[in-house]
A protein has these predicted regions:
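Transmembrane alpha-helix segments characteristic
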Residues: 24, 128-135, 180, 222-226, ...
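Membrane-interface micro-motifs in multi-pass membrane enzymes
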Residues: 43, 122-170, 187-192, 309-349
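Hydrophobic cores of alpha-helical transmembrane segments in multi-pass inner/ER membrane proteins
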Residues: 109, 157-168, 196-199, 262, ...
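Membrane-interface alpha helices of multi-pass inner-membrane proteins
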Residues: 174-202
Length: 434
């Protein structure tokens, strides 16, 4: 039975969810503030410190552009580097606390995007509350305080979602904005290249199925896609070519499938692989069902976002499966895509179907349980990670995987001597969880 509307229900179903949402965001922010370290971690050294050193030592615009566009592992991180540099110029030095805070702003930005997509105005806050509980949990603990990784794994979706929002019911101005956002998504992390495929499908569907926009949008997007990806791959040195990765996938299809499904369902698995894979299958079934059912009726921005998340996760699985065990799909850095997919599938269902308030309350309770349990389950793992970071910092060691310690230590020492980075006094205390 539907719960009746009234003055009392307005407090219960509008103001109370708003207060609970603010509480969840505040707790996450407090946790972030308590544990923030102004100390570089792994890729921070090569992607942040090395960038500022190279830009400051550059002789002209050409070498500056080269520093911003330079390859980092299999990625190009221009979008993140622009923010690093602006932050550095404003503060006068690199501050990794500041960068971590800016990186985590991706969460409220995405949450606001999703809030605007809720159709049920009377139950809007009750529908939105599970979104907040899912997004502001501790599942991504491994990248929460790791500036470079947080920018890459969080903002690839900020830019990608913004691009899709612009392409939906596209105009010339929105098309231009979508190209810019898609470019930024691509230059956040390699998986952001998936936005060009989903963007093309979005335009083709609007043009040839719904007949809402001219065909030239699809053609223009396709041409720009080829140009951007050609530039991206120009002088890109990597053994992980697309052809090589496809050969790996064809050789071990079961492992790749298990890895991919594990990633998709990792948001609520608490690192139990078979639970993650089950949830991944369930999410895919729901998404496929809705996609087929509404092919002629049209898709919302949320549905296109779902497919961007799925395809970007597939590219990550394609690149990581050959070099790691299936259980590695439960690593915290790869869970953000799953969190967003759960959120978007939830919004898709609540927009398509009228959900009784009693069922919304059940979903709210379930998401609140996941959020609370994430702090209980992942805080000890987070504390171990922070202990290792502090111990490494206090020893004066700046380790980066695949790099000689003498090289990375020299980069940090050079940044310190030039006033680019000022480390906190040693010994640095381990941040305590209160």
């Amino acid at each position: 039975m539907e719960i009746p509307y009234g003055a009392g229900s307005r407090i219960t179903y509008q103001w109370l969810p708003l207060l609970l949402a603010l509480l969840a965001v505040s707790l996450y922010g407090r946790f972030l503030f308590q544990h923030a370290l102004n100390a570089p971690y792994h890729d921070d050294i090569l992607d942040v410190i090395n960038l500022i050193l190279n830009v400051n030592d550059s002789a002209g615009l050409g070498s500056i552009a080269e520093a911003f566009f330079a390859q980092h592992n299999d990625h190009r991180t221009l979008a993140s580097r622009l923010i690093y540099y602006v932050s550095y110029r404003i503060q006068g030095e690199i501050n990794f606390k500041t960068l971590s805070f800016i990186a985590n702003l991706a969460l409220p930005i995405l949450a606001l995007f999703f809030f605007t997509q809720i159709n049920d105005t009377r139950n809007r806050w009750l529908i939105f509350l599970p979104v907040v509980f899912m997004m502001f949990q501790l599942r991504t603990y491994g990248v929460t305080e790791w500036a470079m990784a947080a920018f890459a794994f969080f903002y690839v979706y900020v830019y990608g979602v913004a691009a899709l929002f612009c392409l939906h019911t596209v105009t010339k101005l929105r098309f231009f904005a979508a190209v810019v956002f898609a470019f930024m998504s691509t230059y956040s992390i390699a998986s952001g290249q998936a936005i060009w495929l989903i963007g093309l499908l979005c335009l083709l569907h609007q043009s040839y199925v719904m007949r809402q926009i001219p065909h030239y949008y699809s053609i223009a997007w396709g041409v720009i896609t080829l140009l951007v990806l050609a530039v991206y791959r120009s002088e890109l040195e990597t053994p992980n070519t697309l052809l090589t990765l496809i050969k790996y996938a064809l050789a071990t299809p079961l492992k790749h499938t298990q890895y991919f499904l594990g990633m998709l369902g990792s948001a609520v698995s608490f690192e139990v692989l078979y639970i993650a894979q089950f949830v991944g299958v369930l999410l895919l079934i729901i998404l496929l069902w809705q996609t087929i059912a509404h092919y002629r009726k049209g898709y919302s921005k949320v549905e296109y976002t779902c497919w961007f998340i799925v395809v970007s996760a597939a590219t990550v699985a394609l690149g990581r499966t050959p070099y790691s065990e299936i259980q590695y799909s439960q690593t915290s850095r790869y869970s953000f895509a799953s969190i967003l997919l759960v959120v978007c599938v939830w919004l898709m269902i609540t927009n398509r179907y009228r959900i009784a308030r009693s069922h919304l309350l059940i979903a709210t309770a379930a998401s609140a349980t996941v959020c609370g349990a994430s702090y209980w389950f992942y805080t000890p793992k987070f504390d171990v990670l922070m202990e290792e970071r502090v111990a490494e910092f206090n020893r004066g060691n700046y380790h980066v995987f695949g790099q000689k310690p003498a090289h990375t230590n020299a980069l940090v020492a050079d940044a310190i001597s030039k006033g680019i980075y000022t480390p906190p006094p040693r010994p640095l205390a381990i941040p305590a969880t209160e």
